[in-house]
Amino acid sequence: TLNEIYFPAFKAAVQEAKVGSVMSSYNLLNGTWTTHHPWLLRTVLRDQWGFDGILMSDWGSTHYCLPAAQGGLDLEMAGGEKMNPDSLRYFINRGDLDMNVIDEKVQHILQTMIKFGFMDNEQLDSSIPEDNPASVKTALDVAREGMVLLKNEENLLPLKADKIKKVAVVGQNALRYLTGGGSGRVTPIHYVSFYEGIKAVGAQKGVEVKYIDEYDHLDDDVYVASGSDEHGFNGEYFNNTDLSGAPIATKVDANINFNFQNGTGVEGIGTSNYSVRWTAELRPMEDGEYVFHLGGDDGFRLYIDDKKVIDDWNPGQERYKTYEMRLSAGKTYAVKIEYYQGTGAAIIDFYWTKVGADDYFQASLNDVDVVIACFGHDSGSEAEGGDRTFALPSKQKELITKVISKTTTPIVGVVTAGGNVEMQSWIRHLDGLLWAWYPGQEGGTALGEILFGDINPSGKLPVTFEKRWADNPTYNSYYDSDNDKHVEFTEGIFMGYRGYDKSGKTVQYPFGYGLSYTTFNLSQMTVEPA
C-alpha cells in the first residue's frame, strides 16, 4: 500500500523535482512516530530515493530527542523543544549518540543552503516588483485551468450576451478573498473577488451584473449615536484581545460584515490578537419581531440596551448565534457588539432581519435572467488541525436552500472548497455547477471569463466525488470507534476511484470528470501495455 499508493508522489518530488527539504508528518506509521522512523527516513528516503537535503519535522511533531536524532531527523520545528543542543549534548556525553550523527545533520543543512545559493547571494531581488505582473499572469492562468465545470443543463453556459441581459450574484463568498485556513492562508497584494470579476467581464459585453444580499441588513435603521443623523456603527479598535485600555483608533463602519483576513486597515492593528467594540443606536421603522444574527471567528458578544443577549467569547471556527425580540417603531435601542480576533481566520458578521421580510430578495432574483450563487467553504471552516464536515457550513447551506426556494430563474452554483461536499439536497435544482476550489487572487477574473465564454473550462476532477460520505472507501475506518487514538487504514490500496470500482457504488462525479464548451472526437485510438 505504501509503495503503490502513498510513496509515488513523494518519490517523484525527491527524484524528479529535486526538492531541497522534506517534512515528516504527525502520525504513527506501523506503531512508530514518523519523526522517529529510521526505516522511513533513512532506508526509504535517504538510501532508496537518494535524498540528501534537509529533513525537518512538522510543527510540534517531535516527541523524543534520541529516537528523532537517531532516526534521521535534521531539524525540529518550530523551536527545538525536544531535539536541541542541551538534549543532544546530554545523549552524546552518555555515549548514546555519536558525534558523526550531528555532523551528518549539519552537512545536510549546509549543503542544501549552498546548493540553493543562500550562502553567497542576496535573498531579496529588488528588481522584482512586489505586485509582479508575471506572477499575476501565472495566478490567472492557474485559476483559469483549475476550475471544473460539473453541470451545464441545456448549455446555459457560457452566458450569451444576446440572451442574458441581467445577472444577479448572491452569497457572501462572492465578496470575499477565499482561501483555506492554516498554512494555505496567505495575504495577496491584491485580489479580484468573484463579484468584481463577473461584473467586469459582464460590463464588457453589455450585461448588467448586480450583487443581491440574501439578508436585508436594514442599515438605514442604525445610527452612530443618539440624536445623530449619520448611519453606521462607531468602531473602537484595540491592539489586545480583551478591549482593555484606550482604543488605538476609532472609525465609523457602515455595517459589520467583515473578513479581516488581510487586516482591518487600521494602522497599528495586525492580522491577529486584537479586539473591536462597535456601538450604535437602532431606530426601527416598523413594529414587529426581529432576529439579530451575530457570528464570526473568534469571540463575539451582543448587547441590546446593555443586556447581553448573545455571548460566545471563545476561540474557534466561524459559527453564528441568533436572538429574537420584538421592536417598536419610534423607540430607540442601544446596540453594542464586541469581537476579538486571536489567530487564523478573522470574520465578524452582524445583521438583523424582520421576521418574514424576504419579499425584496425574492423579487430581485426573479427580475434577472440568471442567478450566480457563490457558496461553500473558506478559511473559517476549512483549515489544518481538524477535519471539516462533509456537510456545508450551516450559513452556506441556508443560502443555497433559500435561493432555490425563492426563484425559478436559472441558477449557476459556484462552489469554493478543497474537496467534495454534500450536494444531494440541492444539486438537482441547479442548472449549472462550477467547482472553483480556492482559485487565488485572480479567481474573480477567471470566473467571469469562464461564465461568459472568454475561457473554455478545461479542469478535471483530481478526485472522485461521492454521493454520500458513507460511500467513501475510508468511511468504515475513519472513526476511532474504540477510542484508542489509533486508526487502521483498512481500505488498503482500494482508496479513491479504486474503492468505488471495488464497491460498485454510484458516485456523484468520477475521477477525471469535467465538462467544457466544446465537443471532441477521438479516432484511431490504440492501447499499449504499460
Enumerate the language-model features and the residues they cover:
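Glycoside hydrolase catalytic-domain context in secreted enzymes
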Residues: 1-289, 298, 305-306, 315-530
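A short beta-loop-beta micro-motif enriched in histidine and acidic residues
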Residues: 295
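Residues that scaffold the ATP/ADP-binding catalytic core of kinase and kinase-like folds
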Residues: 312
